[in-house]
Amino acid sequence: MIALGGLSSGRGCGSILKFVSWWGSFLATDGEKNSFNIVAIGLVLRGAPREKMDRNRFQKIVFQMTPVQKFLIAPDKFKGSLSARAAAEAMAAGILRVHPDADLDICPIADGGEGFMETLAPGLDARWITCAAVDALGRPIESRYLLAETPQGLTAILEMAETAGLWRITANERNPAQTTTRGTGMQMVHAAQNDGVVRIILGLGGSATHDGGAGMAAALGHLFITENGVNDDPRASNLGEIRAIDFGHRVDLPEIIAACDVDNPLLGARGATAVFSGQKGASVLDQPFLENALAHLVAVSEGHSAADIPGAGAAGGLGFGLLHFAGASLVSGFDLLSSLLGLEARIAAADHILTGEGSLDYQSLSGKGPVGLARMAQTLGIPVTAFCGVTDDEARGSGLFHALHALTDSGLPLDRLIAEASPLLTDAVAKANFFKP
């Protein structure tokens, strides 16, 4: 610390000294090597013009003088602008701009919606399988899923958004009463027919559907009986016509694990209709019909216990359908992904963690990926800095993050934030302060 005594007094010097003390406390566990770093920083500051020694330059100098830092970069998608992998690459570019020698562990995360398979594929050394299916409106498509060898055996990994996701239909086509999960069921049948498959993991989220999983169940072989015969295309618009369900014709299935990041039941004030149907195109006037359709499905199938399970309302009630018609278990999408990717060990090996998503707000605090990651890191004592498109006071005040940076803080218009999300995210990371205050 003797070297710091040579710093001339004057405006701005106090903040620099405070900043050095922050870095000193950050390094204080590493003995003589850190004492050397503090002295070296002081020597640099002695010869540096104060007016040019801004925080970003100081951070770069510190990074260059200290042992290589290891960063775990693990964002979720920035919906509408960046996939999880694209967000991770933008963050990595920001770190490398300041610290070219940083050790980076890039690990995009997902909650079960769009990008679930893409996130898992590299870490599991999985292979892609294609199969015929239909989209949320019943139109033929070519879809794909993953096959991967895991400690539990050969596993098929699907995401319902691959067939029945909102991304596959236009805004004008959104009509939850006319959508189907049949394509998801077709994928499940195809996956189950692969030799040696012992389980199917299915990510829920990003759905355009609201059929309670009835379309999926019909594809699996369940018969939905009406006064006019068998309805092989059940949708919310015609669920009320069902008089009975024949459960005796379902195809054989391996273990089914459904991954989701919501804990909503199927019905009621927190159910699929009340919470999620609006984003799929339903108006307030449509909601009573949609709620009654799901309630009728529960009654005619005697599925009351399944309807109350947390997560039953996921993906327009597909959570319920998987529980009741496929014998699935529902698990946290983050917990499942964490297990498959060995996330806890990767967190423990990092000096600092970067995460984020498009909207990091009060809803995220219910357990979405970045928050689950931050909570795990908090128990291990690893600091987490989050970046997002937009945030709120609840997320900022959660105490989970070393710092939280929102792109909207820049004051730029929304269209530019979306169009230039990647370079703006890179700039935000490069300018961020990763020192402990």
Identify the function of each model-found stretch.
Residues I2-L7:
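Extreme N-terminal basic, low-complexity initiation segments
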Residues S8, A48-E51:
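Short linear/disordered segments characteristic of secreted peptide precursors
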Residues K18, K33-N34, K52-N56, K60-I61:
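Polybasic, lysine-rich low-complexity intrinsically disordered segments
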Residues V20, D30-E32, G42, R46-P49:
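Short, low-complexity, charge-dense intrinsically disordered segments
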